[in-house]
From Swiss-Prot:
Beta toxins bind voltage-independently at site-4 of sodium channels (Nav) and shift the voltage of activation toward more negative potentials thereby affecting sodium channel activation and promoting spontaneous and repetitive firing. One of its GO terms (biological process) is defense response. The lineage of its organism: Eukaryota, Metazoa, Ecdysozoa, Arthropoda, Chelicerata. This is Beta-toxin Cn7. It is found in: Secreted. SMART domains: Knot1. Has the structural arrangement of an alpha-helix connected to antiparallel beta-sheets by disulfide bonds (CS-alpha/beta). InterPro entries: LCN-type_CS_alpha_beta_dom, Scorpion_toxin-like, Scorpion_toxin-like_sf, Scorpion_toxinL, Scorpion_toxinL/defensin. Pfam families: Toxin_3 (PF00537). Expressed by the venom gland. Its main location: secreted. Keywords: Disulfide bond, Ion channel impairing toxin, Neurotoxin, Secreted, Toxin, Voltage-gated sodium channel impairing toxin. Disulfide bonds join C16-C41, C25-C46, C29-C48.
Length: 55
């Protein structure tokens, strides 16, 4: 499963400005989803990969 990560407080996606491989997105995805997650910047928001099915 894949998808954007959102802020639980306001429901907004995590913004990013460097498209493609992005250390910020990778770090945020791993923090919120787990060590096996991947992440990159897609359409100026952080996109996470390898999410659990219940995410």
């Amino acid at each position: 499963k894949e998808g954007y990560i959102v802020n639980y407080h306001d429901g907004c996606k995590y913004e990013c400005y460097k498209l493609g491989d992005n250390d910020y997105c990778l770090r945020e995805c791993k923090l919120r989803v787990g060590k096996g997650a991947g992440g990159y910047c897609y359409a100026f928001a952080c996109w996470c990969t390898h999410l659990y099915e219940q995410a």
